[in-house]
Amino acid sequence: MSKEKFERKKPHVNVGTIGHVDHGKTTLTAAITTVLAKTFGGNARAFDQIDNAPEEKARGITISTSHVEYDTPSRHYAHVDCPGHADYVKNMITGAAQMDGAILVVAATDGPMPQTREHILLGRQVGVPYIIVFLNKCDMVDDEELLELVEMEVRELLSQYDFPGDDTPVIRGSALKALEGDAEWEAKIIELAEALDSYIPEPERAIDQPFLLPIEDVFSISGRGTVVTGRVERGIVKVGEEVEIVGIKDTTKTTCTGVEMFRKLLDEGRAGENVGVLLRGTKRDEIERGQVLAKPGSIKPHTTFESEVYILSKDEGGRHTPFFKGYRPQFYFRTTDVTGTIELPEGVEMVMPGDNIQMKVTLIAPIAMDQGLRFAIREGGRTVGAGVVAKVIA
């Protein structure tokens, strides 16, 4: 089967469904693809095509995820749906499927349930910037007041986790009825699509963000100086610009005097490219793997942060035993391991393989970091967990 050429005409936005088990996330995913295909063109995906999600590996962790695509007149959406609760936790923490916004599915027949709360909290911790609510199964609730009550509960829950509950779009619909072709409920899916278009801003492209390059290797070239290599994570570096070297040691400034790719000289290096950057007046032993080159002032080194972490189960090749406070693993950021100590939340004595947990981490050396930075937890080179920086402390 030949792959279709990907058309880059429209802005591309990543979204996904979140919410409690059996509230209708997968049915809604199928309904969106079906109704939008019927209305604006594109491919419909049936419920069972989405439900038996293929397994994939992200950072050594097995996650089942379904990816579907759909279009509105103004945008192209890539949408993820996970079959099981554990898959959501892993997906959101590893960032395997980054979301520019999420559709929170809440069954009007049940109202908010434990996983509703947990997914909202995870969204807050891992930096999902926008949430839209789809109140599902509204065809099964005759009482208007009950719908009002459920909507109010969901809004309060969002506000509790620092999302703007009062301003969040809430669409009342029935994914199943829409999927069956009932025009009244199909209209609600179009309303949801319009909310996605208007409420989730177009994401800033990596190339428009401040320059950052994680350093993978450092070479000394006689007569020319020091070259660092790596893949530009975001932004652009131009020859002649000042850059900072951040992390592990004290931050220093230097100037980029050359950029090369595949032994060709360029005048700039752009997001996504593997490049060598020549630095003026910097000695080979002043730089090491694990530091980053960055636009001056755009990122700071930190040692202490709150994180949301998933600990691999034994079956995933993780630990066989729990760990306790005082645990000192390595934290792998971008290109290097740094040892750190952990503090567990109050009342938590131990962490079992397969758990997800909030923990405070203190590293023995500073790393250039912002909220949302992903990391792996390793013991002797073996991955035992995955995490994300939820909040920088110091």
UniProtKB/Swiss-Prot annotation:
Residues bound to GTP: 19-26, 81-85, 136-139
GO MF terms, alphabetically ordered: GTP binding; GTPase activity; guanosine tetraphosphate binding; translation elongation factor activity
Region (G1), start-end ranges: 19-26
Region (G2): 60-64
Lineage top rank: taxon: Bacteria
The EC number(s) this enzyme carries: 3.6.5.3
Family per similarity comment: Belongs to the TRAFAC class translation factor GTPase superfamily. Classic translation factor GTPase family. EF-Tu/EF-1A subfamily.
Protein name: Elongation factor Tu 1
GN (gene name): tuf1
